[in-house]
Amino acid sequence: MEMVVQGVSTRNIKKVTEELCGESFSKSAVSEICKELDVPVKHFKERLLPEHYPFIIVDAIYLKAREDHRVKSKALFVAIGINNTGHKEVLGFEVYDSEKVNTWRDFFENLKSRGLRGVDIVISDAHAGLVEAIKESFSGSSWQRCQAHFTRNIIDKCPKKYSTGLASELRDMFNAATIEEARRLKESIYDEYQDVANEAMTVLDEGFEDSITIMALPSKYRIALRT
């Protein structure tokens, strides 16, 4: 069962059990054993969410899955809730064909139907469909652009010879003690790099304010919510 949880294929499970146990398990037998996971997974995904989670982090991870005798790319949506004490909990996950407004909306509405409420800040990357669904499903909440994704977006547009220095200065900017200090450092970075990394500075300028939403919170929350 542990091999299944770790993502080992049924074919490889068969090989491992033969080598370790000296006994052969067919792929169908392994598949039947795997079905034992269906009930606890279903229970986990459908459980109620009575606790208050003012902050949620959402993201999609792309995985390969076999469907209709073909290997396809699938998007695994994940939501992590953070309560007032800083405790993190996986609120839900679901597999979709792709990231679109309607798939993210469906995912969020499922969380809300299970009791998710009072969300103050949603942290995510800047995928257009995701951001639009956040606005629709969590109206009145603030959006924090994931600082790790944002940094990569900036560095991807920066000439390689400047990327290390820029990445270091961006870290200092995000580690600033106050919003005012972060804004001062942002302007300094912009002035320093606009001539040599103009596209990167455009990304920084356009997305900066959304990336410092959490700066309005007490410092004890910021590290957990930045990405």
Show which residues each predicted segment covers.
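Short, amphipathic alpha-helical "recognition" segments used to contact nucleic acids or chromatin
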Residues: M1-G7
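Conserved beta-strand -> loop -> alpha-helix junction used to position metal-binding or nucleic-acid-contacting
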Residues: I121-A128, A133-E169
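Short, solvent-exposed positions on alpha-helices
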Residues: R11, S28, D120-I121, H149, ...
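Short helix/loop capping segments that flank catalytic or ligand/cofactor-binding pockets
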Residues: K14, A65-R66, V131-E132, D156, ...
